Amino acid sequence: MRNLVFLLPIVFVMSCTSDVAEDSVTWADTDITFHNEMMACTAGTDFSQDSVNAMMSEYRSLLNNEDLVGAWGYIPASAENRFDNGWWELSWTSKEAANAGWSEWNSNPDAQAWSEKHANVMECDVEGRSSWTFVWTYDPYAFGEFEKVTGSFASDFAPCSLNEGKSFDDFKVAINDYIAWLESLDREEFSQAYAYGLYLPQDENGELPTSNFNFWWGNFHQSFESMLQGNNAW
């Protein structure tokens, strides 16, 4: 399933201090935000690497919306995963762009024919999709670009919550400390692509809550080997 990326859950622990050098890279230097959607997916009776490759090839030919900036599939890489199903992720420039994109997709006869044709390969819960504000707080290409031939990479996701009495501003300080640690790594030793992003919840208006919320942290590595290297360094 070369065109899909993989999930591997870990417990993510961050140790933070409040000292950040004035000339270091911080959250505010990047702060690139998108509207991301997640859909739970289940494999059908015709699920195989070949059938998925064919399905994805046709899917890419249907994409012509410039506001859809990314689409990824995830399958479990371990029996110990938090979820035994797969996931489909879409990244849009905004919530409004996502709504317009879905309206266009649902009215496209070719898109509907594609969905029906491959229903036995993979079925995704479109109506039950969840929405998140996705934030790159650090340059996703700081460690280089991800391999593009297969498009696969290794990822892990961790559920997070703010500690009691801590605010979102406190969290930003912690993020800046993590960025400072990333900046300290030897790029010759850590030469494979790595990026991370935050999946922040939205209220009914698509806005971020101000306190008492849970979120997801996503790590994206070029390979499971580089994931292990990074985890050991941390």
Question: Model segments located where?
Answer:
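Sec-dependent N-terminal signal peptides
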Residues: 4-14
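Short S/T/G/P-rich N-terminal loop/turn motif that feeds into the first structured element of a domain
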Residues: 16-234
